[in-house]
């Protein structure tokens, strides 16, 4: 490792950020606990889908604007620190709202949860641009795959701890107080991760673009870039459709609830199993990515999504649902590493914020696939839900075979 990149201290801080952030956010995991919280307060399957989409994809509306502003920044740390503080407050607010209003005003509680999730996710729209640019500056391409695999390994370990913590709180306190405690405790845990990444050693960017006069001009140039770059188009199509697993994922837990007894221990087991799958898979993803096999990583990850959703058709025991979440845990991490590394390898340094913003904006529309899932489940049934999910995942797998290693 040289003096300007791949510093061990930055490597450790990147890992700590992922570790503590995962412990915190897994408390409201959109595929397990969040649907149960919304369901407890009387929310419909449509609202479950909306909140899951809000938590995962509420940031997309500001991504391009964040990139427009960030084009001339030589340092991103001052800006990402503000994002961290806002996200902490939003998560803490959700917990306090559940405790204050949960028993007496379920509708007000749902509104506060939605507001908190919106602020938490909206602020991440700025943070994602800053974070990826910092990662590209402090780690070389090959070491980047290694550090992100380590990050995801320890993030999964944090998820294991989070599952145990969630099970303990859910079993120790009655609802809805237990839900509020989950958010309050986890907000302080994730704050440790924010502090870790806020102190990385960020070098100045040596190449920046001249900022356009207006945001409208920036949008025009950005989409002209998208039209001219065929490899970017293939990447975006592949990873957008790969998010089709979200059509079904938030509702698998509700399907399971009709077939098995989902007490706090069972819920914690599913969360833990997903994190074990993620943690163990990173041995494979780190090895593949470190050797530059990001295309193969994408191929395998999307195939795992297909296996998981196909299993949901026939699952009827806790063990089968644990298998589903185990497979999905691995697939999510593999897909994240492949998409992140491929876009950073493709983007020129001076255009990196624009490439990142285009990727996140377009792919993040897939985060709203859970809305489609809520609609399908509301008007049809689980078989229709799973079938449409599989069709879209097979299309994603086809496009992933056309990716180029960079």
Give short role names for the model-derived ranges.
Residues 96-115, 313-325:
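Helix-loop junctions at membrane interfaces in 12-TM secondary transporters
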Residues 1-8, 204-237:
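Juxtamembrane intracellular "pre-TM" segments in multi-pass secondary transporters
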Residues 62-78, 170, 280-293, 377-378:
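Helix-to-loop junctions at the C-terminal end of transmembrane segments
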Residues 124-139, 334-347:
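Intracellular juxtamembrane helix-capping segments at the cytosolic ends
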Residues 78-96, 296-311, 390:
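Structural signature of the two symmetry-related core transmembrane helices
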Residues 35-40, 68-72, 95-104, 159-181, ...:
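Transmembrane alpha-helix termini and helix-breaking/packing motifs in multi-pass membrane transporters
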């Amino acid at each position: 490792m040289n003096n300007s990149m791949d510093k061990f201290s930055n490597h450790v801080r990147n890992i700590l950020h992922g570790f503590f952030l995962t412990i915190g956010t897994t408390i409201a995991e959109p595929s397990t606990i969040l649907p149960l919280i919304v369901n407890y307060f009387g929310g419909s399957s449509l609202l479950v889908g909306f909140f899951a989409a809000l938590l995962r994809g509420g940031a997309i509306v500001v991504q391009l604007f964040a990139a427009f502003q960030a084009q001339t920044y030589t340092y991103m740390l001052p800006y990402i620190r503000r994002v961290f503080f806002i996200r902490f407050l939003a998560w803490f607010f959700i917990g306090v709202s559940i405790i204050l209003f949960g028993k007496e005003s379920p509708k007000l509680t749902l509104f506060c949860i939605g507001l908190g999730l919106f602020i938490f996710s909206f602020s991440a729209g700025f943070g994602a641009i800053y974070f990826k640019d910092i990662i590209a500056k402090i780690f070389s391409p090959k070491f980047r795959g290694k550090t992100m695999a380590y990050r995801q390994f320890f993030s999964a370990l944090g998820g294991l701890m989070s599952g145990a913590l969630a099970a303990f709180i859910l079993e120790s306190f009655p609802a809805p107080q237990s839900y509020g405690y989950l958010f309050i405790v986890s907000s302080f845990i994730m704050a440790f991760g924010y502090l870790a990444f806020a102190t990385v050693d960020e070098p100045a960017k040596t190449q920046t673009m001249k900022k356009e006069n207006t945001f409208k001009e920036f949008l025009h140039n950005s989409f002209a870039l998208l039209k001219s770059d065929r490899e970017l188009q293939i990447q975006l199509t592949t990873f957008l459709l790969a998010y089709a697993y979200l059509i079904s994922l938030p509702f698998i837990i509700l399907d399971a609830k009709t077939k098995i007894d989902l007490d706090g221990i069972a819920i914690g087991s599913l969360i833990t199993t997903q994190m074990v799958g993620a943690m163990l898979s990173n041995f494979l993803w780190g090895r593949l990515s470190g050797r530059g096999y990001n295309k193969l990583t994408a191929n395998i990850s999307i195939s795992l999504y297909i296996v998981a959703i196909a299993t949901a058709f026939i699952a009827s025991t806790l063990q089968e649902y644990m298998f589903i979440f185990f497979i999905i845990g691995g697939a999510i991490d593999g897909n994240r590493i492949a998409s992140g590394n491929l876009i950073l390898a493709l983007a020129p340094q001076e255009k990196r914020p624009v490439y990142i913003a285009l990727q996140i904006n377009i792919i993040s529309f897939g985060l709203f696939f859970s809305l489609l899932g809520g609609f399908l489940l509301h008007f049809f049934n689980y078989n229709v839900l799973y079938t449409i999910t599989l069709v879209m995942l097979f299309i994603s797998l086809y496009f992933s075979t056309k990716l180029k290693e960079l």
